Amino acid sequence: MASSRREFLIVSGGTLAASALNLAHPSALRANPLGRPIGLELYTVNAELDKDYEGTLKKVAEVGYTEIEAGVSTKRAAADAKKAFDTAGLKCHSLHIGMGGIEEAIPYAKEVGAKYVISSVTFPVPPKPGPDGKIDMKALFAQLSSFTLDDYKLIAARCNDMGKKAKDAGLQFGYHNHNFEFKPQSGGAYGYDIILKNTNPSLVTFELDCGWMAAAGHDPAEYLTKYSNRYSLLHIKDFHPTDAPSTGLSPDDRPKPAELGRGHIDYKPIFAAAKKANIEYYYVEQEPPFTTTPALEAIKIDYDYLHAMV
């Protein structure tokens, strides 16, 4: 807010616009851990969006969120999504893409105004659906857990390729982690480190999913410090504690999700490192299932928790 006050003395027009935003979203006046708006990854409210797209976006904005990370939708044209975002007062700076290539995501990202295109999960070779047109998720989870160091080198090469295509289109490609990249490999190496070291920094940035990294037994603050120039975005989520690190995504392997502050992850050192790394955007993302607290209630708990940290 100090910056906004300085701008008040210089650009009155900008102040009027900011004032209008703050009246629409009073909670935007509150401090937050990184000194910039708290975003929401729309995956968190996927089920609600399927039932009422525009109404759910409005409820997201009513909580106080002003920024979102969306996904490429096969159900809604990019122009329609952009109109719905604008109507709700939400800015989409980042777009998640599926397990295939980046080609379909580039025009979608440009239409909705996104700067980043982030690969949710990257395979050495994109998986193909079965005869029924569906992906066998059980087989997919098993494949993720069986990746070798050579597979991760192929993943890095794919990231560089997608990064080049994004850059040529005026966008920035990024890699998003889960927990499986931290399954120990031969010689004590980790797939995630292979991807970091074998991708071109000018083509590939990283979105650090702090929750998944912590669930795998690794320290997001340590990575943000060691590779501070590689990160542009964060996913903020929490999990209930487990007896051992989790490095699998199958229902039996993954930890139980929790609202922020109700799990085991200490975000204070993570945000301290993120400030030094000049993170541009950060998004609350809570994993399903929402067995005790509905998603729209959970995102308010998450939002209020982050503001209370300051």
Regions found by a protein language model. Name each.
Residues M1-L16:
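N-terminal secretory signal peptides and thylakoid transit peptides that target proteins
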Residues L40, V60, I68, F85, ...:
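Conserved, mostly hydrophobic/aromatic
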Residues G14, E67, H93-T205, L296:
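Active-site acidic/histidine proton-transfer and metal-coordination neighborhood
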Residues N32-P33, L57-E62, R76-C92, E103-A114, ...:
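Acidic (Asp/Glu)-rich catalytic clusters
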Residues D168-H264, F271:
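Acidic/histidine-rich catalytic cores of soluble enzymes
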Residues N46-K51, E69-D80, H96-E104, P124-P127, ...:
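Acidic-and-aromatic substrate-binding clefts and catalytic sites of carbohydrate-active enzymes
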Residues R36-E41, I68-A70, C92-L95, V117-S119, ...:
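Hydrophobic faces of well-ordered beta-strands that scaffold small-molecule active sites
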Residues L23-D50, G55-K59:
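C-terminal segment of N-terminal export signals and the immediately downstream linker at the start
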